Amino acid sequence: TARDAGVGFILEAPTWRANPDWGAKLGYSPEALDAINLDAVALMEEMRGEFEMPETPMVISGQIGPRGDGYDPGEIMSVEEAQAYHDRQIAVFARTNADMITALTITNTAEAIGITKAAQAAAMPVVIGFTVETDGCLPTGQTLADAIKEVDDATASGPIYYMVNCAHPSHFEDKLADGGDWKNRLR
């Protein structure tokens, strides 16, 4: 565990699909989704209270998933649509003791930019986790380097960092061998 290793830990609220489209498929109202998001962060607060030590700090993250499939960009929203879509969930997290927002399995830059802008409007630090295919590119075909640059350019380097998730390291390790400052944005 993190405590045994003497390192910090990010507690991700289990809210990846607690957003409007996915909630509606399960019959949840917007208010019920708000309560789910609030309760999930409260659970992370309990865990932090029980397990955090001075030498092993714990950060609580409100987790955001993509609007659609995390591996297929499907119909891509505009930046404005993405910001409006994710705004409510992010605003709920901003009312809690969540320390940051983490968006996982994001397939395209328009959604990443919209999420970042919604987080900026709520004064919440945000992390963008892109999905990449076996060629190391986003499902849209865009390179990871170009995606990071596009999001940074559109948001004044808004994300505190980027990550790649749900991909085997062999899918993108050759991309990391290429030069470029964009790699410094990955954690």
Regions found by a protein language model. Give the residues of each.
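Domain-level signal for soluble alpha/beta catalytic cores
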Residues: T1-R187
